Amino acid sequence: MQFMFAALKLELGDTLYYLLIFAALLLLVKHFAWGPVTKMMEKRRQKVISDLDQAESDRKKAALLANQREAALKDSKQEATQILSTAKRNAEKTKSSIISQADQEAAAIRERASKDAAQAKTDALNEARDQVADISVAIAEKVISKSLSAADQKDLVDQFIKGLND
């Protein structure tokens, strides 16, 4: 060992002195710095653990919110589908009702028109019958009032027809 110390040009006393100083420094560092450093490291470790736990908690909350939003979106889509289905059914009912009502009104209009046409026909026939009767009576009166030759009868009918046109 002496050889080692001689090669380094250190004396045994100096070496012991350095060792004592080093040990004292270690004790001082342990007493004054090691505690605060380990406390700081422990706080840092606890903070990292807390941050990891918080991140995991936030991830779970985000996943839960995403699931809730997805369920709400699914419910909204289902509700929209139901609303559209109901609206289509109501539109079909309204369409059928309007068509049925229009058909009924058209049938009523056709029936009224048919009745009006029949009434007009009846009125025209009655009026024509009345006119024919009046004409017949007028001709009979003229025939009775004078005895007519064929030419007179022809003139009488022509005059009567002219009288009708006027």
Swiss-Prot record:
First-listed, main subcellular location of the protein, grouped into a coarse class: membrane
Membrane protein topology class: Single-pass membrane protein
Keywords, in A-Z order: ATP synthesis, Cell membrane, CF(0), Hydrogen ion transport, Ion transport, Membrane, Transmembrane, Transmembrane helix, Transport
Query: Does the record carry Ion transport as a key word?
Result: yes
PANTHER family from the UniProt entry:
ATP SYNTHASE SUBUNIT B, ATP SYNTHASE SUBUNIT B', CHLOROPLASTIC
Q: Does the keyword Transferase apply?
A: no
Question: What is its subcellular localisation?
Answer: Cell membrane
Lineage: superkingdom = Bacteria
Q: Where are the transmembrane segments?
A: 15-37
- Could you tell me which CDD domains the record lists for this protein? ATP-synt_Fo_b (cd06503)
Q: Which GO terms describe its molecular function?
A: proton-transporting ATP synthase activity, rotational mechanism; proton-transporting ATPase activity, rotational mechanism
Protein name in UniProt: ATP synthase subunit b
Please state the span of the N-terminal signal peptide per the UniProt entry.
none
Family from the record: Belongs to the ATPase B chain family.
Q: Which gene encodes it?
A: atpF
How it assembles, according to the record, is: F-type ATPases have 2 components, F(1) - the catalytic core - and F(0) - the membrane proton channel. F(1) has five subunits: alpha(3), beta(3), gamma(1), delta(1), epsilon(1). F(0) has three main subunits: a(1), b(2) and c(10-14). The alpha and beta chains form an alternating ring which encloses part of the gamma chain. F(1) is attached to F(0) by a central stalk formed by the gamma and epsilon chains, while a peripheral stalk is formed by the delta and b chains.
Q: What is the stated purpose of this protein?
A: F(1)F(0) ATP synthase produces ATP from ADP in the presence of a proton or sodium gradient. F-type ATPases consist of two structural domains, F(1) containing the extramembraneous catalytic core and F(0) containing the membrane proton channel, linked together by a central stalk and a peripheral stalk. During catalysis, ATP synthesis in the catalytic domain of F(1) is coupled via a rotary mechanism of the central stalk subunits to proton translocation. Component of the F(0) channel, it forms part of the peripheral stalk, linking F(1) to F(0).
The species is: Lactobacillus gasseri (strain ATCC 33323 / DSM 20243 / BCRC 14619 / CIP 102991 / JCM 1131 / KCTC 3163 / NCIMB 11718 / NCTC 13722 / AM63)
One Gene Ontology CC term in the entry: proton-transporting ATP synthase complex
